[in-house]
Amino acid sequence: MLKMEDDQFERFVGLFSMKDEDFPYNSQVTNEIQTFRKQQVDSQLFFDVLLSFIEGIEDPSSLYPPKSIDDLQSLFMIIENSNIDELKQQCFYYYLLKDWEKSETYSEQVSLPKNYQHLMDGYYYLDRLKFEEAINHLLLPDVLPNFPDKIIETLYSNEKYKFLIRFVSFVGPPLDTFRKEECYALSLVRYSFLASYHYMKKCTKPLVLWEEMIQLILESNDTQSCKLIVSLPLSQEECEVLFSLLRSKKEPLYLNTLLALLVESNNIQEALELSSNSTHLQKSAVNTYLHKLNSLSS
């Protein structure tokens, strides 16, 4: 451990405590933090990523959570002697002091700007997979999250699709990779197929997203979106992908949508052949309409 000067020791004691009974990182808390770390998409806490900006830190996970007061002093000295500015140091201490339930008092003592408090609160709650609390802090005015890629991936991998949509809509991070486009489109499609479809058309790999969107709504048995698909002015490539997927299974929603699509595209003969070979389709409303349509054209 680096040797502390007297003024540094006073600051340390003023921030934390030298009493063992005050030390919050017991085995239960330590295990919880390590579990949260393993559940992160890249096995890194947001605090790990922040610590990695300090020159010389190669393994942030070995520093947090500290296993003893000596370890905490070592982390304190690394931050104190680091190449980062005072405001960033205060942000690190604010995050650590949340574990000690002293962060609010500290922020008042050093006049830590509110937007930085909310930013660190957001990261703290993301690290603990408390997504609603995290988003409520990260979407406040003047808060500028600086790890949008990790935030998007974290929300998507934890199936927090509404929060992801809110984050993208409010913060407006550049969706400049296919993975980010994919996370957003496949979140959006769960709530608005039409909005997701229009977004998909502007993406770098629209047909790949189109196939993923169709698979998702079919697998989730989203009948309303399937009805909407049939009425869309699809391109030839989109139609080919759609027909291929619909013909891949004999499940009811696949068959219903395929029959409706064949009727809509005026492929009456193929629609009649499909319905005649399916007991399920013979009972459908689309089949009744199909036979009326066929009798009128005969």
Swiss-Prot record:
GO cellular component, one term: nuclear pore
Transmembrane segments: none
Keyword Nucleus assigned: yes
Entry keyword set: Cytoplasm, Nucleus
Domain of life: Eukaryota
Subcellular location: Cytoplasm; Nucleus
Keyword Cell cycle assigned: no
Broad class of the protein's primary localization: cytoplasm
GO biological process, one term: nuclear pore complex assembly
Record Pfam families: ELYS
Coiled coil: none
Name of the protein: Uncharacterized protein ely5
Naturally occurring in which organism (per UniProt): Schizosaccharomyces pombe (strain 972 / ATCC 24843) (Fission yeast)
Lineage: Eukaryota, Fungi, Dikarya, Ascomycota, Taphrinomycotina
Gene: ely5
